[in-house]
Amino acid sequence: MKKYILIPLLILSNFVLGQDSITYKYNVDLTGSMNNANNNQQNNIVFSTFNSVNWKKFETGMSTNYQLMTTNKNILINDFTLRVQPRIIDKNYSVFTFGQLSQLTSKKINQRIETGVGGGITTFRTKYLENTLSYGVLYYDNTYVDPTIINSGVRHSPRAQFFGEMKNYKLKYFVECLYQPKVGETSDYILMTKSWVKFDLNKLLGIKLQYTTAYESFFATGATNDIKNFLVGLNYSLN
């Protein structure tokens, strides 16, 4: 049954595509870094996409994220995530549901399935800065390389976002913090942050500087549970 979790979300996507007066958004990021110290070389590349279809107050978004990190040609991270998120958006609130499928070799997880619901509000909006707060609840199931490890259940998922832009300087910025403690077991949690600054070169291309962190308190022996990335690259955006 697990493989059918995303089917209702894809059906909703097709419904939206069949309506009139729809708009599209397409966003691609290609960022990376290279380091060399005492002949020890580390390469890190992240490729992510976001596509959305909007009709009236309905939006269906699909995002992907792939990261490959190597040290002296040895693979440390080789992770991929696919997320589908339909939502209803108004000026000061949103209601959403989502399904997410991941393969996380860095964490020795063959497959992670997540599905949940939630809502968010806009707490303030100024010329240069906006803040949104959201809360969701999700069910997750991890399938580890080691089949003796079992970790599934329900997590809280509060999130805070700050973002804005300075149009005169062609500058956009974004900060996000996500905390996901397991229900009934707060020692098992996930903490992620993301912050970036983008300078638009033209209507389609921009230069992006990004810093992300991802920490998981529950992890398999030998897994990479604390990941930090500082990345520089290009952004392509079509609205």
Where would I find each of the regions flagged by the language model?
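Short glycine/proline- and aromatic-enriched beta-strand/turn motifs that initiate or cap beta-hairpins
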Residues: 19-61
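Transmembrane beta-barrel strands of outer-membrane/channel proteins
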Residues: 28-34, 62-66, 84, 97-101, ...
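Solvent-exposed loop/turn segments connecting transmembrane beta-strands
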Residues: 35-44, 70-77, 103-111, 145-147, ...
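Membrane-embedded beta-strands of outer-membrane beta-barrel proteins
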Residues: 47-49, 82-84, 117, 158-160, ...
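Residue-level signature of outer-membrane beta-barrel architecture
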Residues: 51-53, 86-88, 101, 121-123, ...
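Detector for outer-membrane/organellar transmembrane beta-barrel domains
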Residues: 130-181
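Outer-membrane beta-barrel "beta-signal"
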Residues: 226-239
